[in-house]
Structure formats: structure tokens, C-alpha cells
Design a protein with these regions (language model features):
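Short secondary-structure subsegments characteristic of cysteine-rich extracellular domains
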Residues: 302-310
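Long, low-complexity segments enriched in small/aliphatic residues
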Residues: 193-253
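Intrinsic low-complexity, disordered N-terminal segments enriched in polar/charged/small residues
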Residues: 255, 264-265
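Residues forming the flavin
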Residues: 1-210, 256-258, 269, 274-289, ...
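Terminal low-complexity tails and localization/encapsulation signals of metabolic enzymes
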Residues: 234, 265-270
Length: 340
């Protein structure tokens, strides 16, 4: 109550082993924009790690408007930029993963306490978007939670003191100063960057107003016939790859014959409504091809390949009718990320 709708992004990450001559341990690269258009929020990271490895990724805001857009293919296309391609040339992709990130910031923080539980870290949404980091704020919120629980047990104090402690911490101050960055990109990449420069460099995040998130991510898609189609190049299997080979590198696995953990509230909606209005965007926003529309005897059929799911939860967030619910699968199945 009284909060803005939460905002999300889908983050992709690959680990590459590259030519030793191109490796510079500790080097950090960040980019914004390309290959996305001016109206779509996104950016990349390249981190040179140990053992000739780099961590390469792209984060794309799930408030995008074009249902023809494929976040996975935008990430693959990003790797064809000359500055990135020259790093990867002669290298080998060894791991792949994807995950939804909470990007709403201070305006979208939910109530963080309830009977018997506290919300901390990314469950609450403490990611600092301008810094592209959240592990430090997550750890601090966990420390505040520990202090709160101790007071609750030892002094019989209410868990509501958690929010009081949180608001007095440096985490709240940091999120307050970063609060206007993400919503400013609703004006487009160029204006968003200009505003962010003014807000963060000149005013240090202390402008006397707070921009709002007006729409949830599932509300932003426009009808497919109103938006331009996007033709993505076929993967070259050197720099760019398909979803099938990528899901293999995620190590995902689910026990056979278990109940499908991607549940449809209305099983007829994907074909009877979403396919016609939005060209069924689940075919594209899923980073591993869980959802397909297959034609059988000239009749379209919505297929869920739940065994491929890497638990990114993008479908639960972006589905325009909120018809898909992600629930925990049986048997501890899912991706095996290892060094990711």
C-alpha cells in the first residue's frame, strides 16, 4: 500500500575462457543502450576474472513495449559489437544463465516485516541500480534483520522496528540517493542519461522530488500489430548461440514426470487471447525456450517445456495477463550454476 509497482529486469550472464593475451584480470567494462533502441532500458557488463575467464552479461528492463523483442537474442546480438567481439575472438563459452532482477528501488520497497518473517536483500529489492550492485545492501539488511530478531526474542520487541532500523541505516540513504535513476529512463536512453548525470553528479541524488514508477512490467506491452517486427540473425555458434545449446550450459535438470511447475490460471488464454493480441511473447521473453506455439493439424497449441526452466521467473513477471504462475518444482530441480 502506498508503494509504486515493482520493476524488474532480466539479466543474462555467460562465462567465457578467452585468449590469455586479451585477458586483463580486474578490468571492468559497463555499457548502456546498444543493441536496444532508445526507448528500451538496458546495459551490459564485462568483468575480467581469474584463470583467463571473463563474466559477460546484459540486463534488459522488463518494462519494454515491443512484444516482438527477444531479450535472449538482444544479448546474443550485443556480443557482435566490434569492441566485444575482439575480446571473445578465439575464446570459448563455458557457462550460461539468466535471472530476473528487482530494479524498482526505494519507491517500490514493500512492507519488510510480517508475523514471523522479515524481507531482506533482493527479496525486498535493495539493489542499487546506478552502481549495478546489491550484495552490500543485501548483507547490511541481513545484519539489521539479525539485530531485529535478537531484540524481538530478548526484549519482546515488535518486528516492526526492522523498518525503523532500516530507514536509519546507510542502505536507506544509498537507495534514496539512487531513487530517481531507473524511472528517468522512461523518457528514453538519451534523456535518461542526461537526467542521471544531473541527478547523481550535480545534486548527489538529493533533488527535491521523487519520480514514480507508474506501471507494472506486465502492463507495458503494446499490441503486436502496432509494433515493428524484429528479425534476429541466426546464431553463428562462435559468438552467438541458440537457446537449446545455452540451456545445456546452464546445467538445468528436473525429474521426469513431475507436475509442471509453470502453472496456467487459464489454459485457453495463450491461444485465445495472448497469441492474437501480442503474438504470444512468452516464446521470446523466456531465455531458454520453455514456451512454444506449435501447429498441429492447422491448429495452434501452447506447449510448456518445463524441463528446460532455469527459474529466472521472467514469465511470472512479464506475462501480460498474469496468467503464468511459477511455483517451486519437485525434487530440487533447476539450474546448476557452479561458478556463475
Amino acid at each position: 500500500k502506498g508503494k509504486n509497482p515493482q520493476q524488474y529486469g532480466i539479466g543474462f550472464k555467460e562465462i567465457w575462457e578467452i585468449d590469455e593475451k586479451k585477458h586483463d584480470e580486474g578490468l571492468v567494462m559497463h555499457t548502456a543502450g546498444w543493441p536496444l533502441d532508445n526507448k528500451t532500458y538496458g546495459g551490459s557488463f564485462v568483468y575480467h576474472a581469474e584463470n583467463k575467464q571473463i563474466f559477460l552479461g546484459y540486463v534488459l528492463g522488463l518494462d519494454y513495449q515491443n512484444p516482438h523483442l527477444s531479450p535472449f537474442d538482444e544479448f546474443q546480438r550485443f556480443k557482435t559489437h566490434p569492441s566485444i567481439k575482439k575480446i571473445l575472438e578465439g575464446g570459448k563459452r563455458i557457462s550460461y544463465g539468466a535471472r530476473a532482477l528487482i530494479e524498482g528501488g526505494l519507491q517500490s520497497l514493500p512492507k519488510m516485516y510480517m508475523p514471523g518473517a522479515l524481507l531482506v536483500g533482493c527479496d525486498a529489492g535493495t539493489l542499487n541500480m546506478p552502481k549495478i550492485k546489491g550484495s552490500h545492501t543485501a548483507m547490511k539488511s541481513g545484519m539489521i534483520a539479525a539485530e531485529t530478531i535478537f531484540s524481538h526474542i530478548a526484549e519482546k520487541r515488535s518486528l516492526s522496528i526492522f523498518e525503523d532500523k532500516f530507514k536509519k541505516s546507510w542502505v536507506y540513504k544509498e537507495l534514496y540517493e539512487a531513487r530517481n535513476v531507473k524511472p528517468s529512463f522512461k523518457w528514453g536512453l538519451i534523456l535518461g542519461i542526461i537526467f542521471t548525470g544531473i541527478d547523481q553528479i550535480l545534486f548527489r541524488g538529493k533533488l527535491p522530488f521523487t519520480l514514480k514508477h507508474k506501471h507494472a512490467d506486465h502492463e507495458t506491452l503494446k499490441p503486436a500489430n502496432k509494433m515493428p517486427k524484429i528479425e534476429y540473425p541466426k546464431p553463428d555458434n562462435v559468438f552467438t548461440f541458440d537457446k537449446t545449446s545455452s540451456v545445456y550450459l546452464s546445467g538445468t535438470n528436473h525429474a521426469e514426470n513431475q507436475p509442471v511447475h509453470l502453472q496456467l490460471k487459464n489454459p485457453n488464454l495463450p491461444i485465445n487471447f495472448t497469441l492474437d493480441k501480442y503474438d504470444e511473447p512468452a516464446q521470446r521473453y523466456c531465455p531458454v525456450g520453455v514456451y512454444e506455439v506449435q501447429i498441429e493439424n492447422s491448429i495452434p497449441k501452447f506447449v510448456i517445456n518445463s524441463q528446460n526452466c532455469i527459474h529466472c521467473k521472467t514469465c511470472d513477471i512479464k506475462e501480460p495477463s498474469q496468467n503464468i504462475t511459477w511455483v517451486t518444482p519437485e525434487g530440487g530441480g533447476g539450474p546448476k550454476y557452479g561458478n556463475m
